Amino acid sequence: MKLNKFNIIAPAAALLLSASLSSCMDDLNKGNIDPTVDANPNITGLYSKCYAGLIMEGNDGNADFSIDDAGKSCLLRNLFNFNEVPTDEAACWWSDGGIEDVTKNKFESGNATLKNLYYRLMSNISYENHFLSLDAAQEDKTKYAEVRVLRAYSYFLMLDFFGDPTFIDKISPETPRQAHSYNSKFEEGKTYTRAELLQLGREFLFNWVESELLAAEPDLLEAKPETDTDPNYGRVDKGTCWLLLSRLYLNAGTYLNNDGQNNQYWDKALEYAERVINSDYKLFDDSKMSNEAKANGYKPYDLLFMGDNGSNGASCEALLPLMQDGDKTQGYGGSMFFVAALWDATMQTVTDKDAATTANTW
């Protein structure tokens, strides 16, 4: 779906068409001539792709966008890099791709690691916009609502990390004015910069994310934990929506630039947090563990991160599990990243006998 090539390919297609007007008239009774837009997309595949963007790098081992290392494009890996590495919780010893500056809380527009997060989120948004633009997608109200929540989550992360990012809710826009549905604030005939047309402000984005989540909620599945044998396992439900609303409201003061005047939003944050707490989702504790797991000395927290956490009982507290398995979703951005990249002082080092050196991680 190389939508960014529209302006180049469409004129070429028009030129070829004009050169063949002497052909039969039936040859002109065509549908969309833009080869970058599939007139009959695989709805199920596109729906799955919207979820895959949370944990996968791409469809075939390569990233969804141009990058030197596909593993660096994974959303989960980038969320860890920017939520944990700049804090005292973790440090990264690597020096490539700008991660050293992230460790030191030095953020500049040219930082490659920062770009990876931005490009991943915009890539996800493009797939979500595509799905939501299709008439056929609206036939299943539940799945349509799920993707609305996924897109709202993408923009919530953009709001949280970047403040005032580019906002686009259309596909294949020819001009910045056609990139979204909120052009009433711009006067016709007046010249605006690209940033003015596409960056609508943190207050706008806060209100938009809130409205999308509230609009999607009624059509979502009920808040209910599932196991990996259930067909609805891994899907967005009302619990996911409530949790995201609670997080949005909790930090409203920053997003709306009105710290100290947020009692109404704190009350809303509490309301939606209590909805999750009072739902069927529960914390995984000893009473829910199998006798075998107890005999092996595991704690409930341990089982949350096991390969069988979709069937060992731990999924009772997983509001939005990110789906991975060793056969279908391999990569260096998800769980493999945490296994291969993390090390602490109590772990044995791995010796590279050929190089006569030791390595703690990658």
Spans of model-derived segments:
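Short coil/turn linking the two alpha-helices of tandem helical-hairpin repeats
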Residues: L159-D160, T166, N251-Q261
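Polar, glycine-rich mid-to-C-terminal structural blocks
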Residues: G253-T254, L270, E274-W362
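Conserved, well-structured interaction surfaces
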Residues: T44-S48, A52, E57, A90-P165, ...
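Bacterial Sec-type N-terminal signal peptides, specifically the leucine/valine-rich hydrophobic h-region
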Residues: S18-L21
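Bacterial N-terminal signal peptides that target proteins for export
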Residues: K2-A10
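Membrane-proximal, proline-rich intrinsically disordered regions
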Residues: C24-R77
